Every structure is written in structure tokens, then in C-alpha cells.
């Protein structure tokens, strides 16, 4: 198992991990900006 620092072991790649990264960006700069940066859309 791999520990991704989330406090729990994950036996597989979390399919929601990219969304979590977007959520973290959204907390810092706002959702629309985070979405645009991550997906490359306006």
C-alpha cells in the first residue's frame, strides 16, 4: 500500500486525486481560476 499523506493507505491510484488537486487550488485562487488552470479552458 502507498501512503499519499492523506492519513490512510491507498492500494490503488485514487481516481479523484486530480479533483482533490483542483479543490486545493480553488481554496487558494477561486474555483474558476483553478479549473481554468487545471483543464486549460476558460
UniProtKB/Swiss-Prot annotation:
PANTHER family: OSTEOCALCIN. Residues 1-40 form the Gla domain. Sequence data obtained by MS from fossilized bones of about 21 thousand years old. The modification 4-hydroxyproline is found at residue 9. The gene is BGLAP. This is Osteocalcin. Keywords: Biomineralization, Calcium, Extinct organism protein, Gamma-carboxyglutamic acid, Hormone, Hydroxylation, Metal-binding, Secreted. It is found in: Secreted. The modification 4-carboxyglutamate is found at residues 17, 21. GO terms for cellular component: cytoplasm; extracellular region. The carboxylated form is one of the main organic components of the bone matrix, which constitutes 1-2% of the total bone protein: it acts as a negative regulator of bone formation and is required to limit bone formation without impairing bone resorption or mineralization. The carboxylated form binds strongly to apatite and calcium. The uncarboxylated form acts as a hormone secreted by osteoblasts, which regulates different cellular processes, such as energy metabolism, male fertility and brain development. Regulates of energy metabolism by acting as a hormone favoring pancreatic beta-cell proliferation, insulin secretion and sensitivity and energy expenditure. Ca(2+) 3 binds at residue 23. Belongs to the osteocalcin/matrix Gla protein family. It comes from the Eukaryota. One of its GO terms (molecular function) is structural constituent of bone. Gamma-carboxyglutamic acid residues are formed by vitamin K dependent carboxylation. These residues are essential for the binding of calcium. Signal peptide: none annotated. GO terms for biological process: biomineral tissue development; bone development; brain development; cellular response to insulin stimulus; cognition; glucose homeostasis; learning or memory; negative regulation of bone development. Ca(2+) 2 binds at residue 21. The lineage of its organism: Eukaryota, Metazoa, Chordata, Craniata, Vertebrata. Ca(2+) 1 binds at residue 17.
Amino acid at each position: 500500500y502507498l501512503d499519499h499523506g492523506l492519513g490512510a493507505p491507498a492500494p490503488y491510484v485514487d481516481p479523484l486525486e486530480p479533483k482533490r488537486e483542483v479543490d486545493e487550488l480553488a481554496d487558494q485562487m477561486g474555483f474558476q481560476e483553478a479549473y481554468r488552470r487545471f483543464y486549460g479552458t476558460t
